Amino acid sequence: MISLKPLYDEIICLACFLTLFCGCDVYQPTKCRSYVGGYVQMNAIDIWQEKGMPSYLIVHLKEEPPVKTYHMCSTGKDAEIYTRLCTKHEDMTYNKVRSIGPAIEDSTPFFVDCDFTSIEVFADKDFNEEHPAGSNLGDIVRFMSWSPIKYIKSGYSELHIYNPEELSSAFYPIMREYFMENYFQRGALSTCYPIDKLICDTDSDDLVLLGHDAPGFLGALYFEMSPDDEKEFVITVTFNTDDGKSLSATTMMKF
């Protein structure tokens, strides 16, 4: 039996070439083998507290130039890395047509190039009696994010149906600050499923393809308890990756 894969790959590369070099306004209907159109190399995280928001931190990809990407139009070694990541996520049979523009990252979902095994959160001072300085706060900090991995592993057939009763009371007020309101309408369909768990209840299956089709936002860390006495802490957050890295960031947090 003759394999059509080389021909298929050539067609994809030709479509990408036309998209990238035929003009800034050109959008080409392109059959995408995978749901995830590209990955961004991740080497560091950034965390911060939004002004006037005392109870949570944002976790974000820290983009340190040059930003390295692997995507559906990559060639050579980068194309091999992209295919390996798609294979890892069982994302090889999407085969739907998208309109791909000059900036590929704006036309198709992108995610970071690693998944995570665990999250750790520490404070530099006693948080309360049960959480002295340096202890893990995973049992009082909730991780909130999105991921399309359930949609992908369903064979691209099972969309998430938004139901606010299935989520914590903190999910909507926080996440609506970063995502369009229509994501939060009752019954709204989405390829991305919400993640809404105490850190101590998460495992590696919950920490795959984090974000909502874009590689920057990784999630929010909501503190379900306020500290007993101190109101200002140095908080350190560590994301442990499935390729053996520990990515840490520190910020001052005021409650």
PLM segments and residue spans:
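Bacterial N-terminal signal peptides that target proteins for export
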Residues: 2-12
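Intrinsically disordered, compositionally biased low-complexity segments in eukaryotic proteins
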Residues: 16-17
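C-terminal motif of bacterial Sec signal peptides marking the signal peptidase cleavage site
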Residues: 20-23
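Non-catalytic macromolecular-recognition regions in eukaryotic signaling proteins
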Residues: 25-255
